[in-house]
Amino acid sequence: MEIVQLSDIHVGSQFREDVFQKTIDEINSLKPEAVVITGDLTNEGLIEQYEKCKKMVSQINVEKIIAISGNHDYRNTGYLLFKKYFPFKTENELGDDVVLVTLGSARPDRDEGEVGHHQNLWLERTLKKYEDKLKIVA
């Protein structure tokens, strides 16, 4: 199974669409089963950045795209927009043998992230459910 992981795309004023298009082309040539984007899809969490990012990410020819928010995605009103543009599940089965579990550490308008006690308890319970699978935590 091939999984591609991306992070820190930062669609915004400094974003290089031509460079990201080459990345998309490379990913498509690999034909992975899934793509995981681990935060900072946008730079300021603005609606036009989400729209552009969604349009570009939609060019990736893959069955499953799993996006996790980063601190930049939660800036301004981005925390209200993320789920609209990138709906996600916290438990993602990939094939018969792999599960990818996501944790969110972003907080609105804060640079630092946090995985708290309740999330750690949830993670422990969730991983036990999949004891017979390879587990990836992102």
For the regions a language model picked out, list residue spans one by one.
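Residues at the starts of beta-strands that form the adenosine-phosphate
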Residues: 2, 33-34, 64, 133-136
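N-terminal active-site segment of His-dependent metallophosphoesterases
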Residues: 1-56
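Extended active-site neighborhood of metal-dependent phosphoesterases/phosphodiesterases
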Residues: 47-134
